[in-house]
Amino acid sequence: SIFDNFLADNLNDLDEVAPKKLNYKDCITESYKENLEYKIGKNYNPLTNLIGNIDNIEWKSIYKGFREFNLPLKDNDTIKLIKMDPGTSVPLHSHNGKEYILVIDGSFSDEYGEYKKGDMQINDQNIKHHPTACNKNGCVCISITENDVIFFGKFASILNLFTFIKSFFK
């Protein structure tokens, strides 16, 4: 799994059940940044190199105000680019494993705080949250998850069934 090494130490440091909040700059050492800038230039954008111009993505509409773009990974790991319109929410859920969310543009908030451009939220299977896009422009983020989402609340059984069926078509 790609999660075995990806920021795993940060999850082990959690004393209470709450997401870990980092800024992407916290994850990169100064010497690494300088070396990277020397090799590829200051305007290097790994997201653009991975998927191209974000404005040209063919988003898949999941429900009103929520779109995603899936990038293929092996095993049960998923990486998605998610775009939420202002005020759009994701139902209360957790994950059957780890989840990393990096905000690329705009912001979202949940029970644990507000996450803005450059912030990273790190969750484990004990975290339940209900993210809502709260910026006037909505929110664009990268979500990397280890396993399927588990929904809670009024429509949980329907949403979980949909997730189960969808897992056969990955």
Range-by-range predicted roles:
Residues 1-55:
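Positively biased amphipathic helices and basic secretion/translocation or surface-docking motifs
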Residues 110-130:
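Short acidic-glycine-tyrosine-enriched beta hairpin
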Residues 72, 81-82, 91-95, 112-113, ...:
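Short histidine-centered beta-strand/loop micro-motifs
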Residues 85-88, 95-110:
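Glycine- and acidic-residue-biased ligand/ion/polar-headgroup-sensing regions
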